[in-house]
Amino acid sequence: NVEVYAMLAQLKRDKSKNPDMLTILCGCMMQEPEVIERIKKSYRNVDIIFGTHNIFKLAELLAMRLFDQDAKRMIIDIWKDTTEIVEELPNSRKYSFKGGVNIMFGCNNFCSYCIVPYVRGRERSREPEDIIEEMKGMVADGVVEVMLLGQNVNSYGKTLEHPISFAQLLRQVEQIEGLERIRFMTSHPKDLSDELIEVMSQSDKICKHLHLPLQSGS
């Protein structure tokens, strides 16, 4: 937090020299009410603040700030929680041959030293059809390696109307033609199943390692 406030102080000085500059804050830290109050009080140079649940609204908030004369003030749009997942968002990749795919959001574990359940909400899984469709599009663009992402991928699928296991999802992902390597993170040990171990042992595409969160030991 100290680094963020130091950066805001620097940006405040920069904005005094360039009044048209916009300062936008987002992410986990913005989900904390005391942080918002401090920014409102001490860093009025900030133009837009939003949290972890509505990143897809960036363009809308930016347009509001730029073109709405009634919005020439600090815009704060924080969602305390959500059950929604917005699909078909545009994305860009740093590398042409690999990319990450979110399969779920939030977490139901409350490990020591971890703020995720408080700021990103409870677990919400994407429908497998949406995941597969996104990955097929990536492969068509030349991607050969994917990283399946979630705070705890081992508990994927439990919140779906028609629940499936993470191992079952991996079997579907394996069937995508042109996809060569599959990685995933993060895997909470308490939800690691024998089915997942079996799928990994039988697969020629799934990389043979597990990414375990250190805080799960607490």
Regions found by a protein language model. Give the residues of each.
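Proteins enriched for Cys/Gly/acidic motifs involved in redox and nucleic-acid/cofactor modification
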Residues: 1-149, 154-156, 210
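Conserved SAM/AdoMet-binding glycine-rich loop
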Residues: 23-27, 32-34, 140-218
